[in-house]
Amino acid sequence: MIDQGRKSLEERVGHQFKNPALLERALTHKSFANELRNTVEHNEKLEFLGDAVLDLVVGEFLYEKFPTDTEGGLSKKRASIVNEEVLSELALEMGLNKLMQLGKGEALTGGAQKPRLIASSFEAIVGALYLDGGFEVARSFIRQEFVPLADRVCGHEDFERDYKTRLQELVQKSSKETPRYEVLAEEGPPHDREFLVCVKVKEDVWAQGRGRSKKNAEQMAAKNALEMKYKETN
C-alpha cells in the first residue's frame, strides 16, 4: 500500500498505527499472499476479529437505542445492518477497494469491486484498530462510520415489517412465480446514497421503491406492490 494512501486512511479512521504492518495486513487479500507463497500475512484473521468487535459495538448501540426491544428484535436489527451490502458501501466510500492488495487473478476478475471482498476489508480494518489501539479506538471508528448509517436504517418507520416475504407468499400462492428486484438508479454521494428499485413479476414491473440501502429500497418496492396489487396498506 502506498504511503499516501495509508496516511489518508489513518486520518479517516482517526488513528495513527503504532504497528503499520497491521494496517497493511488488513488490506492484504489471501490471493495476494498466496502468490507470494505466504511470505506476507493476509487479512482473514483480522476480518474474524473485526466481525466480533463490530457485532459488539453495533449490539451496544441497538441496546441503547431500542431499550424495550426483545432479544429477537435486536438480533433482527443487527442482522439487517451488519451485512455485506452495508459494509461494502462503507468500505467503498472510504476508498478501501483502491487500497486492497489482491492477487493478479483476483484483480483481473474484478476483485476490487466484489462486495464480499470489500466488506471483508472493512471488518479487517476494525480488527487492526482493535489490536493496535484497543477497544475504545475501534469503538470510536465504528460509531463514527457505521452507527449513523445503522441509525437511519433502523429508524425507518417500515423497518419492522417484512414486505418482501409477504409479497412473495401472495405471488407464489396465485401464480407460482417469484418476484424479482432490480436497481434502477443510485443517487447521492457514497456516504448518503439513495437507491431506486423496481419489483417485477415475470417481466411486468409492479412497483418501485426508494431507500438508503438496496434492501430497504426493495422493502419499499414490495410494500408499494402490496398496496397496488393486493390493497394491503399495513
Curated annotation (Swiss-Prot):
Stretches assigned to the DRBM domain: 162-231
Domain RNase III positions: 6-134
Listed EC numbers: 3.1.26.3
A GO-annotated cellular component: cytoplasm
One BP annotation, GO: tRNA processing
Active site as annotated: 51, 123
Assembly with partners or alone: Homodimer.
NCBIfam families from the UniProt entry: RNaseIII
Protein name, entry field: Ribonuclease 3
Organism listed in the record: Bdellovibrio bacteriovorus (strain ATCC 15356 / DSM 50701 / NCIMB 9529 / HD100)
